Amino acid sequence: MHGLAGALVVIAMAGGLTVEQDRQLGDHVRLVVGPMNGAVIEQDGRRLVVYGAPADKVRTAERVLFTHARRDVAEAGRALVERGAVAVAPAAEEAFFHEPRRFWEDWPQKRFYDFEQQTTKILTEPIPVGRTVKGGDVLDWRGLAIEVVDTPGYTRGAVSYIVTVDGVRYGFVGDVIYGQGHLLDLYSLQDAVPDARIGHYHGWAGRMGELITSLRTLRSKGLDVMVPARGPVIHRPVEAIDTLIARLQAVYRNYLSVSAGRWYFREGYDTLARRVLGEDPDVPWMAQAEHVARPPAWVVPIHNSRLLLGESGRGFLIDCGGKAIVEEVRRLNEGGTLRGLDGLFITHYHSDHTDAVEELLEQFDVPVYAVRPLDDILARPGAYRLPVIARPPLRNLRIVDDGHGMPWDGLRLTFRDFPGQTIYHSALLAERNGERILFVGDSFTPTGMDDYCLQNRNLLHEGLGYLYCLDAVRGLPAG
């Protein structure tokens, strides 16, 4: 499994991306290489181009076929369209060609509280589309019948184009595959899965099911050659598709087996498994860890926050993401259960853990503790592009180093860097009368690790990310 998973994604670094050379694929089909592959079909002295081509290699064409609207691919065809070529694009993504400015006008605010986590690789200037297409359409160009196939996955509305030229059946497949069984990236598959009742943020590789369906559709088309938007031309399509599907399924099976989400969405995770792995998914689910139904009396659960009570009745709050939390703290304070608040600890920057901090500070002017990797993102959230980041900067910040400890009202508090759910994440070890509790924010549940969203940068590598967190837990004193 590890070998399959490790070979799935192309590493975009020196030596990681295979660069093709310009060459003839057939008597009437030529590969032209630029930032993206360009496929040039010539008939009757005229040209049709798929994807695009550098201006110094192809000056004009009658049509340019776009497989999807991602900027890194679509820009390759812009110059040809500006010189008169008719742009053909998927109907489902037409708005990204026609109205990209609307996306960017909304972006300065939409990037906060961003649960959808879709790509920002959107065109910055429009490309006029002369014709839109969808699966089942057939384009007639100079005697060639070009079949349009819906192939969502890498993007929601992508299409592929299939045509036979000189007896060779070509598939121009965009980014559904790279080389002999790879994928350019997993980040682009993030999406909601409505039939599993999984929202965008929790939809880790949510379009993997659609991608596999698209790959199987292409497999059934009897292709001789696949020309993706980038990377090497694929001359053994069936083998490449089967390899990629096996790798995708291996990665997804591994992901599901240790996902924290199963604790919250058990039935939904069964649905996720069937969508990608089939009716008998055989996921080696991690055994559920023991969990404590009721914490000790000095820990008061308040929604997704925890209020620590000291020996004198003073309080120390962990996270504050909603008004209901502030209202409950105020109620406890007014009722005498709580005798004032001494501090607030932030585990991570997500809005459901920080949104009500300012409201809390208006009523309890306390220091806001955070471990050093969080200092900048809490003070300058607008400088970051990360999921569900809250807009307002936090004030009253008191930044401490990893491992910093302090006594507080009969407890010992130790602050830890804990880059689990997201790279900017912390934990708090609280000790009282021999009881030790590590508050880990959203990093773990009894079913595994909280890895819903690839853009959180939850890393898996020796000494980093979740493995660093597990090492930290192993190093805790027994108790």
Residue ranges and their predicted role:
Residues 30-31, 123, 128-130, 150-152, ...:
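Short Gly/Pro-enriched turn/cap motifs at secondary-structure boundaries
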Residues 231-283:
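Binuclear metal-ion centers of metallo-dependent hydrolases, dominated by the metallo-beta-lactamase
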Residues 5-16:
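Hydrophobic h-region of N-terminal signal peptides that target proteins for export
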Residues 19-57, 160-174, 178-179, 285-334, ...:
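Conserved beta-strand hairpin/beta-sheet module of binuclear metal-dependent hydrolase folds
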Residues 47, 138, 145-238, 248, ...:
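Metallo-beta-lactamase
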Residues 101-129, 176-200, 242-256, 382, ...:
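Active-site-proximal loop/helix segment associated with metal-binding centers of metalloenzymes
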Residues 29, 54-138, 324, 332-407:
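Active-site HxH/HxHxD metal-binding segment of metal-dependent hydrolases
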Residues 23-24, 41, 136-141, 308, ...:
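Short acidic-hydrophobic surface loop/beta-edge motif
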